Amino acid sequence: MAEFHPTAFLLPAAVTMIAGYFLCTALYNVYFHPLAKFPGPRLYAASQIPITIKRLLGDEVATFHKLHAKYGQFVRVAPGELSTINPAASRDVYGHRNPAKSIPKDFKAYYMKNQRRDGTEGLMTADDDLHRRQRKIFSPAFSDRAIREQEPLLKKYTDLLVEKAGVASDADGKVDMVMMFNFATFDFIADCVFGDSLHLLEKMEYNPFLANISAVVKFSAMRRAIRSFPYMDETFEKLIPASMKRKRMEHVKFCDDLVDRRLEKAVTNHPDFWTLVLRANEKGEGLTLGEMHQNSFLFLTAATETTSSLMSALTYLLCQNPDKMKKLVDEIRGRFKSTEEMTTVSLPPLEYLQMCIEEGLRVYPPVPGGLPRRVTADGASLDGRELPPDTVVYYAHYASYHSAAHFARPDEFHPERWASVPPSEFANDCRDAVIPFSAGPRDCIGKNLAYHEARLLLAKFLWTYDVELCEESKDWIKQKSFIVGVKRPLYVKLHRVVREK
């Protein structure tokens, strides 16, 4: 008689039990979970794995777009996750209609959360009370008055971009405008944040900090994807390569050192953010050193990515739509005799320029996916639909902005849809669906500055050059996305406009 080995029975039993557990969990998620009433593919409702794979591949944005086109305004994209493109629901998510009832951020999704040993948090990761205090301190740095004081800096780097782009195009026959807009926006914001430029436009080369930012952002997107699984925080941290951890800390130290050097100068006449913050500190209302460090990294990334992405996209979209380019160029060149006349006061009245910027933000939102919010124990309501506690909810920007339910010819670039009286074809467009800077009490503090920067950059650039898209960049806009679009080089040829003297 053969000897009985318990392991011969235990192993199949264990496998069967584990398989049974996952099967029962999947069945519960699909048919009995509180979110089962929302439409979406059953595979996504059953398990976190499908959407996680899409996120790790950079395909979340395209996936959300396809799912909303098929299932409508609300789509269940994972067992406990809901994506919406409903404009009214977006106001509930962000607290635009009632700030007290906004759904809190899902801090598991933010890699900057709890990154410092002292527990310091910045605007991005602070709870609502701390966010209100910090935002009140920073708000004067983004006011109209502050922007007027910063205008000489903005003009300085805009003029330098125009000059350097022309030199590069003449030398190589083409120039990468993604690189140029990155250099200009980082130099300007660094001067505002640290009181000194990074000198990227002068040297015409990436420094290690800027060269690695895309890798850091991609890392944070992947970390968010993995952390959506229970108990994966510690496991993920152990799997992070030492080289990636080192780069992350180098980024933190780079910003900290720049802030420390700036603070040594105390209050100055230089129109940067910290002069205003230090004045608040003198009144006993300011930030701790840790809060200054934490926010400096945020400003140097978030405040540059929006404008750089928008400018790159606008350059591409205008080149691909020569009739729109001509209309904009005629407006700019017909209004100004020189670029010196272009200011933060003289540019806002240009209607078609503003319409192009708004349409650029719609077609190519800088943050195309959804920034997650997590429902508290009290539950929440989205446009009359009840959500259970712990639900993660997104407003899917790209999917909403490219929805045929919201816009006529949604995938095409038509600035005219933003006219005060739009053509009849676009009269029923749902322009309220477009909120690229978010909404509510935690909307982007720098949106006013971003608009002024975009107007000045685009106006001076197109006043000076005729722009021709290179063949190798014809499909530039087809991109992966890890929180932001993964931008490839955008090569154009620049032809300086010759004017009669």
Swiss-Prot record:
Listed GO biological process terms: biosynthetic process
InterPro entries on file: Cyt_P450, Cyt_P450_CS, Cyt_P450_E_grp-I, Cyt_P450_sf, Cytochrome_P450_monoxygenase
Biotech exploitation of the protein: Radicicol is an important pharmacophore as an inhibitor of heat shock protein 90 (Hsp90), an ATP-dependent chaperone involved in the post-translational maturation and stabilization of over one hundred proteins, and which activity has been implicated in diverse pathologies ranging from oncology to neurodegenerative and infectious diseases.
UniProt note: phenotype after gene disruption: Abolishes the production of radicicol and accumulates 14(15)-deepoxy-12(13)-dihydro-radicicol, also known as pochonin D.
Listed cofactors: heme
Cited CDD domains: CYP60B-like (cd11058)
Pfam families noted in UniProt: p450
EC number: 1.-.-.-
UniProt GO MF annotations: heme binding; iron ion binding; monooxygenase activity; oxidoreductase activity, acting on paired donors, with incorporation or reduction of molecular oxygen
UniProt subcellular location: Membrane
Lipid bilayer topology: Single-pass membrane protein
Sequence positions that bind heme: C444
Glycosylation positions in this chain: N212
Pathway stated in the Swiss-Prot or TrEMBL entry: Secondary metabolite biosynthesis
Family: Belongs to the cytochrome P450 family.
Protein name: Cytochrome P450 monooxygenase radP
Species annotation: Floropilus chiversii (Chaetomium chiversii)
Lineage, highest ranks first: Eukaryota, Fungi, Dikarya, Ascomycota, Pezizomycotina
